């Protein structure tokens, strides 16, 4: 049982790291930070705002793919060059940030 828990924790840490790496690779971190507002909102604030929303992953994945404006201030977020799977992966990761 202890080995299973260790493997599960290490596996989840790897997923979190991989998604942060994807965010860096795609340029997301140029405007966003995990905990502090930059040009765009902190990912922790995004996660808090959409916590409990049933369609949060799909909603955020759509915003990542298509861009958006007016939700977090006057600076629009341009559409991002990501696949549907990458957008969903990033959205799930963002929503996991505390």
UniProtKB/Swiss-Prot annotation:
Q: Where is the signal peptide?
A: 1-18
**InterPro entries in UniProt:** Cyt_c-like_dom, Cyt_c-like_dom_sf, Cyt_c_ID
How does the record describe the protein's post-translational processing? Answer: Binds 1 heme c group covalently per subunit.
Q: What keywords were assigned to this record?
A: Electron transport, Heme, Iron, Metal-binding, Signal, Transport
The molecular function GO annotations come to: electron transfer activity; heme binding; iron ion binding
Disulfide linkages recorded for this protein, renumbered to the chain, are none
Q: Name one Pfam family in it.
A: Cytochrom_C
Q: Give binding positions for heme c.
A: 28, 31-32, 77
Q: Please give the function described in this protein's UniProt entry.
A: Reacts with hydrogenase.
Q: Which protein family is named in the record? A: Belongs to the cytochrome c family.
List the protein's name.
Answer: Cytochrome c-552
Originating organism:
Hydrogenobacter thermophilus (strain DSM 6534 / IAM 12695 / TK-6)
């Amino acid at each position: 049982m202890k080995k299973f828990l260790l493997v599960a924790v290490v596996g989840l840490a790897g997923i979190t790291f991989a998604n942060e790496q994807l965010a860096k690779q795609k340029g997301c971190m140029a405007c966003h930070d995990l905990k502090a507002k930059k040009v765009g909102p902190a990912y922790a604030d995004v996660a808090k705002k959409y916590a409990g929303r049933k369609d949060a992953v799909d909603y955020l994945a759509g915003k990542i793919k298509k861009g958006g404006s007016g939700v977090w201030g006057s600076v629009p977020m341009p559409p991002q060059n990501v696949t549907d799977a990458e957008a969903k992966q990033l959205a799930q990761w963002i929503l996991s940030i505390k």
